[in-house]
């Protein structure tokens, strides 16, 4: 099969990369009604599969789970999760033929096998749903022309999808209809109903395309969301220990530092994160971030180029065919790093201490977020999509590191994200070592002393931070989410 994106001409590629529209709340006035009374069969009961299914059932939809015969016979985790939550479970042959909508929520590497198994069983005119478009865009899966193909992609891990729904809200979501598979023109109605059933319409929905979702998602997870956090963790830990910091303290400062720093990012963007620093520290963090952007820009651009061309996907799929040899080797090597094996620190680190002693980490976050955003936008991806795939998801990934270091992050994210993370971090760590050798006292592990600052310089730095395009679009999108949350709570 041919990579779908590469079969398009340049005009079509640019049109699909640039498809992005923030949908009004009034467009979801009918909620999930378009799917009520219809049979929705979910294939896969992992984090997204289970939690989307729970939300959809609570929204009044008929949900069941189709699993492989072996998974049912051996009572595997997917079978246990579905049955323990009271769902009907059956084999593909038992459930797929009656389904009006089949939702494929298995891991990327299983998509081709799953689609080839379920497609012959699907009734004429049924719909096939995805929450990530890799199989369609990168693999180039060919779907029967009578089948409608849609996507609903929550911009959060599955557990968060459920928790926000239970709070009466939802998570920001991208929806799309595959232009090659919308025979009855009902794709958007199906996608909107599915998104509403998960609660996504309460947090904001972007009408996107399979292409824009895949290319931006891959770029975000490889660079700022996972790769930068992994490279930054390893580099910062080694630097602290080399300069005499207790390994246990160094580990805690980094493990929980990302989460504390990005919580400010979540609430008020890069502006608020930088405002948590003293004026001298802010000026230093800004200078460091500008140096980092200059050093890392070619690496970010290479990742984007390889994603656009399909080079990344072909390399990863070759590793799938080789029993994940590269992925498993990189995973094992990461587990043996000094950061992952360091002892735990039993003392307390105050919230402000993470900022005061983590100026370099803040600079890394700022540089990584801005570079990922800028590189995506330069490649034709609309700013709203680039924001969701860079700044918005970063606090969620940082939270996984706070739980069980890099191990937890790499367990929670998809194998696709993990593979891309290793590609980036293995290139980024040696790239930044000369930069790390030139750091000054106060950049990491100790606070920068208070002192006089140049007012004009501080003014210019503040203006540069606040006027960046990601701050402008971020303020708008965070405002939508806040407004919608108030409406949801009031309702």
Curated annotation (Swiss-Prot):
Keywords: Amino-acid biosynthesis, Branched-chain amino acid biosynthesis, Magnesium, Metal-binding, NADP, Oxidoreductase, Repeat. Mg(2+) 2 binds at residues 217, 389, 393. Binds 2 magnesium ions per subunit. Its EC number is 1.1.1.86. Its cofactor is Mg(2+). Mg(2+) 1 binds at residues 217, 221. GO terms for molecular function: ketol-acid reductoisomerase activity; magnesium ion binding. Pfam families: KARI_C, KARI_N. It catalyses: (2R)-2,3-dihydroxy-3-methylbutanoate + NADP(+) = (2S)-2-acetolactate + NADPH + H(+); (2R,3R)-2,3-dihydroxy-3-methylpentanoate + NADP(+) = (S)-2-ethyl-2-hydroxy-3-oxobutanoate + NADPH + H(+). Residues 209-344, 345-484 form the KARI C-terminal knotted domain. Substrate binds at residue 414. GO terms for cellular component: cytosol. The active site is at 132. NCBIfam families: ilvC (TIGR00465), PRK05225.1 (NF003557). Belongs to the ketol-acid reductoisomerase family. This is Ketol-acid reductoisomerase (NADP(+)).
């Amino acid at each position: 099969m041919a990579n779908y994106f590469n079969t398009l001409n340049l005009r079509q590629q640019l049109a699909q990369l640039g498809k992005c529209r923030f949908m009004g709340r009034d467009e979801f006035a009918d909620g999930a009604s378009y799917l009520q009374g219809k049979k929705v069969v979910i294939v896969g009961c992992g984090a997204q599969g289970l939690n989307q299914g729970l939300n959809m059932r609570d929204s009044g939809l008929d949900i069941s789970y189709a699993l492989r015969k072996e998974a049912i016979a051996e009572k595997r985790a997917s079978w246990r999760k579905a049955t323990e939550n009271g769902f009907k479970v059956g084999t593909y042959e038992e459930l797929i033929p009656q389904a009006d909508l089949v939702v494929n929520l298995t891991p990327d590497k299983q998509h081709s096998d799953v689609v080839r198994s379920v497609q012959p069983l699907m009734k004429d005119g049924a719909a096939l749903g995805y929450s990530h478009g890799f199989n369609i865009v990168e693999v180039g899966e060919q779907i029967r022309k009578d089948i409608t193909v849609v996507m609903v992609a929550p911009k959060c891990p599955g557990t968060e999808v459920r928790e926000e729904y239970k709070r009466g809200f939802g998570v920001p979501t991208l929806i799309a209809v595959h232009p090659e598979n919308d025979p009855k023109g009902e794709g958007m109605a199906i996608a909107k109903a599915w998104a509403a059933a998960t609660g996504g319409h309460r947090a904001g929905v972007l009408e996107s395309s399979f292409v824009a979702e895949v290319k931006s998602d891959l770029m975000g997870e490889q660079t700022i969301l996972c790769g930068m956090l992994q490279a930054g963790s390893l580099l910062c830990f080694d630097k602290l220990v080399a300069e005499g910091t207790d390994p246990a303290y160094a580990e805690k400062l980094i493990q929980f530092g990302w989460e504390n720093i990005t919580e400010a990012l979540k609430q008020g963007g890069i502006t608020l994160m930088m405002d948590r620093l003293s004026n001298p520290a802010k000026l230093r963090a800004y200078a460091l971030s500008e140096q980092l952007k200059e050093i890392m820009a070619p690496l970010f651009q290479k990742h984007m180029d390889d994603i656009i061309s399909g080079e990344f996907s072909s390399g990863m799929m070759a590793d799938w065919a080789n029993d994940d040899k590269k992925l498993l080797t990189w995973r094992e090597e990461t587990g043996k790093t000094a950061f992952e094996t360091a002892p735990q620190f039993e003392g307390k680190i105050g919230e402000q201490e993470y900022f005061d002693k983590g100026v370099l980490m803040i600079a890394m976050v700022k540089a990584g977020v801005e570079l990922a955003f800028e590189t995506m936008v330069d490649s034709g991806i609309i700013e709203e999509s680039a924001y969701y795939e860079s700044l918005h998801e970063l606090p969620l990934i940082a939270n996984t590191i706070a739980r069980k270091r890099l191990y937890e992050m790499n367990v929670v994210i998809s194998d696709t994200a993990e593979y891309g993370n290793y590609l980036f971090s293995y290139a980024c760590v040696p790239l930044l070592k000369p930069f790390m050798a030139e750091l000054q006292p106060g950049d990491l592990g100790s606070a920068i002393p208070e002192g006089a600052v140049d007012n004009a310089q501080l003014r210019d730095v503040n203006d540069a931070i606040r006027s960046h395009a990601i701050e402008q679009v971020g303020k708008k999108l965070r405002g939508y989410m806040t407004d919608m949350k108030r409406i949801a709570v009031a309702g």
